[in-house]
Amino acid sequence: MTDESAATREPDQPPRQQRRGRKIAMGPAERDAFLAGQRTARVATASELGPHLTPLWYVWDGTALWLTSIVSSQRWADLARDPRVAVLVDAGEDYAELRGVELRGRVEIVGEVPRTGLPDPQLDEPERLFAGKYAGGDVMHHDGRHAWLRLVPEKITSWDFRMLFPAQKTTS
């Protein structure tokens, strides 16, 4: 797993290595493809009563994770009070196929709250990506209950355990 924490290292220092280091860390292209291909993220916030974990749809634009959340939700209240978040996107059932990406940082609200669809150039790309990923089209439909959150990760950790088990050649 690679620990890419810009907030805790000098600009000229390479990312610190965790267990197994580069052996199972996804490269940027693999990570981007993985995030684009998965559908559900697990979003962890902190409420006054403790951790709060919820599934949420998202899109990744290559630099930021975009989340659309109901503005009357516990998650929204948590993030309004404390914008720190951890997001996990993972896949795999068996140990040898586990892979995932954890993104940590602070979210920021982007656009109107709640979103009704007023033109907003900074939301053009995430809404196009979201409509294509979840609605099979180019147009995002707004229900007046959701709004956008953008997470530009301060730390990204990725792993792909399939790298530990290279495909064995079969002989006939």
Predicted regions span which residues?
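Short amphipathic alpha-helical segments
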Residues: A29, Q74, L79-D82
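Charged, gly/pro-rich active-site loop segments
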Residues: T2-M26, L98-S172
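Short beta-strand segments
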Residues: Q38-V71, L79, V87-V89, R99-V101
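Short beta-turn/strand-loop junction motif enriched in small, turn-promoting residues
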Residues: E48, D90-D94, A135-G136
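Short, surface-exposed beta-strand-loop junctions and turns on beta-sheet-rich folds
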Residues: S73-R75, D94, F165-P166
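Short, basic/aromatic recognition patches
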Residues: Q17-R42
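Short secondary-structure boundary/capping segments
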Residues: D32-A33, W57, A77, E93, ...
